[in-house]
């Protein structure tokens, strides 16, 4: 939970 956008960055 934290990085759920684009580009898909780690949490």
UniProtKB/Swiss-Prot annotation:
Location relative to the cell: Secreted
Keyword annotations from UniProtKB, A to Z: Hypotensive agent, Metalloenzyme inhibitor, Metalloprotease inhibitor, Protease inhibitor, Pyrrolidone carboxylic acid, Secreted, Toxin
Positions carrying Pyrrolidone carboxylic acid: 1
Key word Secreted present: yes
GO BP: regulation of blood pressure
One annotated Gene Ontology cellular component of this protein: extracellular region
Annotated family: Belongs to the bradykinin-potentiating peptide family.
Protein name in the entry: Bradykinin-potentiating peptide 11
Protein's organism: Bothrops jararaca
